[in-house]
């Protein structure tokens, strides 16, 4: 969201007048993200943490939007694309509020993607310390042997970084294919491509949010 002057943040949220806001800022009673604010400072109302006398001021100037999108194949998970490819935002252009994707799905992966303008939720879902899992339905061509399943569940290393083990569970075998569930605790780039033995990916859940069989 576009940044605004700190005084305007106070007046927009009906906390105090502009002049009163200037006085409390000059007195050192206001902090932005834990740092004492000064006159002229600007804030992002959706993502910055503003405190007045030790109390967090919540932004109530815009409504929060939460979208659970069944992302189809062929869309990139960005707000814009320099190559001119279709982005996921083109699928929600009628929302009326600016939203952005939480995390990402590869262009040729499909399934649950959360879009929101809630910065706090985005941080909770994406910060590594929260260790929220992502579950994918993966169709593997052919049958998966016990040895292959053991290998898939073993730790791997990408670019010198040791990843947490992927949990893989066989759900069923259909028409010569193996239907599995992959649970990833890290979104490390290339982890899926290094893990999958020629398969299609469909993300069913992200953190505590589960996607059921919904159309895009």
Protein language model annotation of sequence segments:
Residues 1-216:
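Basic, flexible Lys/Arg- and Gly-enriched helix-loop patches that mediate nucleic-acid binding at interfaces
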